[in-house]
Amino acid sequence: MANIKNIAIIAHVDHGKTTLVDKIMYHCQLFRENENTGDLILDNNDLERERGITITSKNVSVVYKDTKINIIDTPGHADFGGEVERVLNMADGVLLLVDAFEGPMPQTRFVLGKAIDLGLKPCVVVNKVDKENCTPEEVHEAVFDLMFEIGAEEWQLDFPTVYGAAKQNWMSDDWKKPTTNIEPLLDMVVEHIPSPKIEEGTVQMLITSLDFSSFTGRIAIGRLQRGTLKTGMNISLVKRDGRIVKSKVKELHVFEGLGRKKVEEVQAGDICALVGLEGFDIGDTVADFENPEGLKTIAIDEPTMSMLFTINDSPFFGKDGKFVTSRHIKERLTKELEKNLALRMAETDSADKFMVFGRGVLHLSVLIETMRREGYELQIGQPQVIIKEIDGVKCEPVEEMTIDLPEVVSGKAIEMVSVRKGEMVSMEAKGERMVCKFIIPSRGIIGLRNNLLTATAGEAIMTHRFIEYQPLKGGIPERQNGSLVSMEKGQAIPYSIDKLQDRGRFFVDPGEDIYEGQVIGENSRGDDMAVNVTKTKKLSNVRSSGADDKARIIPAIKFSLEEALEYIQKDEYVEVTPNHLRLRKILLTEVERKRNKSI
């Protein structure tokens, strides 16, 4: 089978790329007729399915009309920029998937820009044309304008397009004429995506991602640029810094369907997995044993944000989790560094605190959520933006942010963003909604989403991506309200919560276990207030009729992990355990906090 096509799929969160890949797999009969696989086959960890985002890239391979098509699913989110660049290195063309109603979004621009720079051929799929009020032609023009802006060359601007609805299982050259299957899409891939360029010469393969199997250890994945790899062959590894390490390939796998199949040899142009390589890293080149030649390594986006990870030392530590010591946390973070390229870790002067650097709150919260599900307990400090000194000037990361919201509430939102040093770049009306673009420091984005959703009754859609470092923009107002802090350990009693409701909003339900120093609510004023919600009603034998009204308690506010991280202040931690998220003061007792203040 000589023909191989390697394509990467680019799409904004929730424009349907994972659904599209599902349909391609069904069309190419990867599954037996009676097999029930569930939807979203590619998003294979629970976190991805719940959030509807792809975090790590996947490889799937199908055969269509004697052509082997390797489909590489890319993460759509700029926080996972490290993943994106590696993945595009394996592809020869990209399939750009856009929603017929929303058009190309900022995150799409980020990945597409990388693909255009690498000189890949784009093909466009306008999906969800069955939506009401959609405008496929305008979206097609918007994609053209976007590519032109990014600096695509003429041959890239001459891109083929198909329209369709992946969920309904059809694609067509004309969106007004639905077909019965997705063949037009596959035909477009076979016809327009170039086959891999294969040079003559010795073996060369850039390791672009890795997998881990407890049975065989780490597995290197990449596309073989030239030459032929055979099982048992001796090779050289050219490291990122130019060092050369000798190694040997024990087993070779190629991708087939969703899985891998063991083969004896792999020809140039195909994507393969090597088992048994010792000591490789992502970005190394697998080269010839005698005269190794390295390939250009991948530049990875630098981290822009840091958080402090520390052991859980609250009064409730060890109740939920299996792994609670600093050794466990350090081992887990070190393991994550191997495959999570945009992540960095630094040890601090304390043995149980680690600084972890990443691309944004989402990037780090996905790691924390994964650890939490694996049974770890830990505490996280407030996210801090990384400030760099460039030519003697202090600079901070700046992002491009797009907010899509109803026109009625746009004034409030614009005011909120400008207070946080955001500058509006453009504003356009789409029906009854407005799409506003801002340039805003990353510091300003932390905690903005919560306030925006409150101000717009949950209607605002916010996306942002990192652009560059710019000189510091000055002070940004922090959270206005103080915290309600528990002064006793015990159970929250409805009677006490009821009496304190006019003091602020609570984060705990009646009956929940709490401890001294836990942040159990938000004060309606600006300072912190210690309250006791463990007090019960004193029972005396004097009763007047009607005085014992039932406590009417407003439901507690429950945070998601990102919301909690964005909410806390400098002197607070988020306590993360497999079953609970709690906010707490770093210093638990009121006396300690007062003493610390006076210093």
Regions found by a protein language model. Give the residues of each.
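Acidic, low-complexity intrinsically disordered tails
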Residues: 582, 588-599
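P-loop NTPase switch module centered on the Walker A-proximal segment
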Residues: 1-98, 102-104, 138, 142, ...
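Conserved structured catalytic cores and adjacent interaction surfaces
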Residues: 2-19, 78, 91, 101-113, ...
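A short, contiguous, amphipathic alpha-helix enriched in charged residues
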Residues: 314-337, 550, 554-556
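Canonical P-loop GTPase G-domain recognition
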Residues: 121, 131-191
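Conserved nucleotide-binding/hydrolysis modules and their immediate coupling elements
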Residues: 204-307, 315-319, 481, 490-540, ...
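Residue-level signature of catalytic and energy-coupling elements of molecular machines
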Residues: 14, 20, 52, 71-73, ...
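Interdomain boundary/hinge elements
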Residues: 37-42, 150-162, 196-206, 242-255, ...
